[in-house]
C-alpha cells in the first residue's frame, strides 16, 4: 500500500474508489494499491 498525496491509475485495471472518506486505488496488481494520505 502506497500512501501518496495524489493517487492515479497506473494501469487500465486500476479502480479509483472512496472508502470512509479516503480516495483509494485498488487493482489486480498488489503493487498498484494506493491510498491518499
Swiss-Prot record:
Cellular component, GO, one term: cytoplasm
Keywords, in A-Z order: Ribonucleoprotein, Ribosomal protein
Q: Which GO terms describe its biological process?
A: translation
Molecular function (GO) terms for this protein are: structural constituent of ribosome
Q: Which Pfam families match?
A: Ribosomal_L36
Q: Does the keyword field hold Ribosomal protein?
A: yes
Q: What is this protein called?
A: Large ribosomal subunit protein bL36
Q: Which family is this sequence assigned to?
A: Belongs to the bacterial ribosomal protein bL36 family.
Query: Which PANTHER family does its entry note?
Result: 50S RIBOSOMAL PROTEIN L36, CHLOROPLASTIC (PTHR42888), LARGE RIBOSOMAL SUBUNIT PROTEIN BL36C (PTHR42888:SF1)
Q: Kindly give the HAMAP family that the UniProt entry links to this protein.
A: Ribosomal_bL36
Amino acid at each position: 500500500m502506497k500512501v501518496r498525496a495524489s493517487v492515479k491509475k497506473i494501469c487500465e485495471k486500476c479502480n479509483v474508489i472512496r472508502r470512509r472518506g479516503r480516495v483509494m486505488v485498488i487493482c489486480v496488481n498488489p503493487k498498484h494499491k494506493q491510498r491518499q494520505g
